[in-house]
Amino acid sequence: MLRPLRKSVLASCRHCFKVCGGLPQKQLPLFSPLLLRARYSSTDSSTKRSNKSDKIDAPGFKKIFLVAIIGTVIFVKTVQSLDKNKPKTTLSEEEFENVVKGLKRRVAIFPQGEVDIKFSLSPSIEETRKVLQKSQGDDINELQFVDPVKVIDYYRTLRDDRYEALLNEYYKKYGCDTYAYNLPTGMLVMLLGRYFKENFKAGDKLVVVNFPHSIADATRFENEVSIVSKIFVPRKLSGSDVCKYYETVGKADII
């Protein structure tokens, strides 16, 4: 009895399998809303991730601009530093005037009494020597004469001197006889002081001829180089401002 029952059950199962196997299976359409939503969601997420990644990886414009400015500032400062460290071998007229304005010498090159310096308004060493020979005799043998024009010529022709180029400009403009007295304010006295410092010593007796041409040069010389003990003035120049200036302090000697 059990055998026929088992056969019946097996037959029923086979029948059900055939029926179920034969039914068409339900499939999602190719463009179903669910599928589109899934795809859009996936693409949108990917785009957001990409944008976020770009924002993180790419430097901002402000940062680039700031870096460029900092780099420029560093470059400029470096160039300026190199320019400052570079030795300057020449000076223009404007630069020299700025140097003179900023120069505040506390003491003269030679303290008062260390050297004996006299001025002469005679135009040359020869004329000054001739006049002094009559009045002082052999005493002039101890004197050393200085012609400012020759001093300026010395520095004008001194190779690679910082004032060589500027002095040559004035030489071409004014000529050999007068250019020394047309230099920028203070330059003649400055170069005279430099020459005195390089060539003379304590105890020397000096006469500077054809100098000064103005009270300003006279006072500048005494402030920067040394106090003058006397000035020799030809009679024809006794009415000049320079002569009157030194007469007030009892240093003018009319010759």
Swiss-Prot record:
Record's signal peptide: none
Chief location category: mitochondrion
Transmembrane segment boundaries: 64-82
Transit peptide, start-end: 1-40
Membrane topology: Single-pass membrane protein
Keyword Membrane: yes
Cell compartments where the protein resides: Mitochondrion membrane
Keywords, ordered alphabetically: Membrane, Mitochondrion, Transit peptide, Transmembrane, Transmembrane helix
Cellular component terms per the entry's GO annotation: mitochondrial membrane
Family classification: Belongs to the AIM36 family.
Name of the protein in question: Altered inheritance of mitochondria protein 36, mitochondrial
Gene from which the chain derives: AIM36
